[in-house]
């Protein structure tokens, strides 16, 4: 019997014609349309591409001083070949951007995008009692250190003032000694003049003192 003459279970068992599951292919078509729409939205910027979440550290206090004063008052020659970091303003090497003024620069480095680029989240760690105690201890140590530094600075100022007073004292003493010597020489010269005035005129003439005589003849 030929294939086309078979019927019933025999015919169904030897059916080589491919069958289609309409429900399965309908769902696949819908999913394909959704994927195409999502890709188009991502391309147009209507939707962000799903990326694996990156574990970021908690927001921490900055451990360095932000340099806002080093370029104040300086002039810079800018050409087409000048790197972005030297074109004026404040350059952020993390985000590779230039901010023109200090206020916006601080807003930038404290902002979400900059913190994300350095691996930080905007969440802060909740402080425990131990953290608070440790913070108080650090602040106390800092104050004591600053107090000692202030005492050392005051001691140095006192030493410098004392050295300046000693220098002035020595200078005044030296000036007084010179004045005293001049006065002594002057007194000695006056005494010599008085002694000479008591000599006999003939003796004064013989000694060559006649020109200093003030007596009248």
UniProtKB/Swiss-Prot annotation:
InterPro entries: Matrin/U1-like-C_Znf_C2H2, Snu23, Znf_C2H2_jaz, Znf_C2H2_sf. Residues 142-151, 162-175 have a biased composition (Basic and acidic residues). Pfam families: zf-C2H2_jaz. Residues 188-199 have a biased composition (Acidic residues). It comes from the Eukaryota. Residues 1-14 have a biased composition (Polar residues). It is found in: Nucleus. Keywords: Coiled coil, DNA-binding, Metal-binding, Nucleus, Zinc, Zinc-finger. Residues 1-22, 142-217 are annotated as: Disordered. GO terms for cellular component: spliceosomal complex; U4/U6 x U5 tri-snRNP complex. This is Putative zinc finger matrin-type protein snu-23. It comes from Caenorhabditis elegans. The lineage of its organism: Eukaryota, Metazoa, Ecdysozoa, Nematoda, Chromadorea. The gene is snu-23.
